[in-house]
C-alpha cells in the first residue's frame, strides 16, 4: 500500500472513530494516538525519505491536509461532547430560579474622568471639537512645532521621557493641535478644538507632582481672533466650572508657543475672594496658562499669520479636581484606593 493510500485509510477510519466517540477522555485518546509524535501520520512522514524528490512534496502536502482535517474534526466533536456534558449536568442539578442572585458590585467613572468629561461638555457646548492624539510622539511635533527648536533654552523647563533621539512620550497635548492645524480646511470655517489626554514628565512623585497626569489644551484659529476672545472664553468656562460669580484675571507670563502669554487666575470659589488656605489668602487661584498663538507656530502649520490669528490655553484636570474637592495629594487619584474613590461615586 502506498503512503498516500495509507493516509486515506487513516483519514476514513479516524473520522468514523471521532463520530462514534462518546466521552472527552476517549476523544483525547484518539487525538494523542493519531496526531501525536508517535502517531501514524508522523510515521508516514518519516517514511517519505524513501520517496523520490518528485513524490515528497505531494505526499507531504497531503499528510498536512489530513492532519488539519482530523484536528478540525476533533475540535468540532469536542464542542459537541462538552455541550452534551453541560446539558446532562444541568438536568441533574436542582435550581430554584426564584432565589435572589449574587449582587455584583457596580463601578463608576473615576473622579478625573468625571472632571474631564465636564470640561469637554462645556467646550462642546461652545462649538469646539474634541481631538485626541498619540501619547508617543516625535520630537518634531512635541517641541519644534511648538517653537522650541533643539537649542532653545526653554526646553530646560520640561524634563522628558525619551524613547530614542527623535521619539518621546509627550510632555503636553500640544502636538495634537499642531497635527490638527496642518490638516484643517479654513475655507470651511474656524478651527475650535480641545485636546484632552495623558501627558508625562520626569517629575518626582509627591503630593503635588506626578510623572503622569492629565491635560486639556484648547485652540482657536480664525481671522481676527483677539485676546478679548480668549478672556471671554475662559470666563465662560470658569463660571460653568466654579460658579456664575467667578471672575478671572490675566497676568503676563512666558510660553514659547504663545505671544503674548498670560497666567490665568480665578477668584477663589471657597472664600469668594475674602482669603483662605485654598487661595493662600490672596483671593485668587492660579488655574491655567494661555496666550495668543505665536506667529511662528501658525506659519509652521502652513497658516498665514498675517491673515489668521488664534489663542491657546492649557489646564490640568487633576489640579481642577484637587481644588474643587479639597484633595491635598495628587497621588490619591492613582492609587486605586476605593475608600478614597468611592467618595466621588455618581449614580450612572
From Swiss-Prot:
Subcellular location: Cytoplasm
Cysteines paired by S-S bonds: none
Residues engaged in binding Mg(2+): 259
InterPro entries in UniProt: aa-tRNA-synth_II, aa-tRNA-synth_II/BPL/LPL, Phe-tRNA-synth_IIc_asu, Phe-tRNA_ligase_II_N, Phe_tRNA_ligase_alpha1_bac, Phenylalanyl-tRNA_Synthase, tRNA-bd_arm
Example GO BP: phenylalanyl-tRNA aminoacylation
Ligase keyword on record: yes
ATP-binding in keyword set: yes
Gene3D superfamilies cross-referenced by the UniProt entry: Bira Bifunctional Protein, Domain 2 (3.30.930.10)
Top-tier EC class: ligase
UniProt cross-references to PROSITE patterns, sorted A to Z: AA_TRNA_LIGASE_II
EC number(s) on file: 6.1.1.20
Record's cofactor remark: Binds 2 magnesium ions per tetramer.
Domain of life: Bacteria
Cofactor: Mg(2+)
Keywords, ordered alphabetically: Aminoacyl-tRNA synthetase, ATP-binding, Cytoplasm, Ligase, Magnesium, Metal-binding, Nucleotide-binding, Protein biosynthesis
Family: Belongs to the class-II aminoacyl-tRNA synthetase family. Phe-tRNA synthetase alpha subunit type 1 subfamily.
Subunit structure: Tetramer of two alpha and two beta subunits.
NCBIfam families xrefs: pheS
Protein name per Swiss-Prot or TrEMBL: Phenylalanine--tRNA ligase alpha subunit
Organism ancestry: Bacteria, Bacillati, Bacillota, Bacilli, Lactobacillales
Amino acid at each position: 500500500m502506498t503512503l498516500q493510500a495509507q493516509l486515506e485509510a487513516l483519514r476514513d477510519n479516524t473520522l468514523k472513530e471521532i463520530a462514534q466517540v462518546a466521552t472527552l477522555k476517549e476523544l483525547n485518546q484518539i487525538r494523542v494516538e493519531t496526531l501525536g509524535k508517535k502517531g501514524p501520520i508522523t510515521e508516514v512522514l518519516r517514511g517519505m525519505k524513501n520517496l523520490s524528490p518528485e513524490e515528497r512534496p505531494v505526499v507531504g502536502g497531503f499528510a498536512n491536509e489530513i492532519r488539519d482535517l482530523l484536528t478540525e474534526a476533533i475540535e468540532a466533536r469536542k464542542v459537541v461532547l462538552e455541550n452534551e456534558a453541560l446539558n446532562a449536568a444541568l438536568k441533574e442539578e436542582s435550581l430554584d430560579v426564584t432565589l435572589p442572585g449574587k449582587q455584583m458590585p457596580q463601578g463608576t467613572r473615576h473622579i478625573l474622568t468625571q472632571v474631564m468629561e465636564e470640561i469637554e461638555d462645556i467646550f462642546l457646548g461652545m462649538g469646539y471639537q474634541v481631538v485626541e492624539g498619540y501619547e508617543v510622539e516625535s520630537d518634531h511635533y512635541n517641541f519644534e512645532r511648538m517653537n522650541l527648536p533643539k537649542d532653545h533654552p526653554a526646553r530646560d523647563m520640561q524634563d522628558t521621557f525619551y524613547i530614542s533621539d527623535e521619539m518621546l512620550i509627550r510632555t503636553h497635548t500640544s502636538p495634537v493641535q499642531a497635527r490638527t492645524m496642518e490638516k484643517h480646511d479654513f475655507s470651511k470655517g474656524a478651527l475650535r478644538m480641545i485636546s484632552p489626554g495623558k501627558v508625562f514628565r520626569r517629575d518626582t512623585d509627591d503630593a503635588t507632582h506626578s510623572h503622569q497626569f492629565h491635560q486639556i489644551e484648547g485652540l482657536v484659529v480664525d481671522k481676527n481672533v483677539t485676546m478679548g476672545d480668549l478672556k471671554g472664553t475662559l470666563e465662560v468656562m470658569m463660571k460653568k466650572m466654579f460658579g456664575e460669580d467667578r471672575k478671572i484675571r490675566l497676568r503676563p507670563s512666558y510660553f514659547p508657543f504663545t505671544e503674548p502669554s498670560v497666567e490665568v487666575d480665578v477668584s477663589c470659589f471657597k472664600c469668594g475672594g475674602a482669603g483662605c488656605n485654598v487661595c493662600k489668602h490672596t483671593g485668587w487661584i492660579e488655574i491655567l496658562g494661555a496666550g495668543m498663538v505665536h506667529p511662528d507656530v501658525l506659519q509652521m502649520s502652513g497658516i498665514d499669520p498675517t491673515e489668521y490669528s488664534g489663542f491657546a490655553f492649557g489646564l490640568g484636570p487633576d489640579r481642577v479636581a484637587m481644588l474643587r474637592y479639597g484633595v491635598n495629594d495628587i497621588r490619591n487619584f492613582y492609587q486605586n484606593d476605593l475608600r478614597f474613590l468611592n467618595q466621588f461615586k455618581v449614580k450612572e
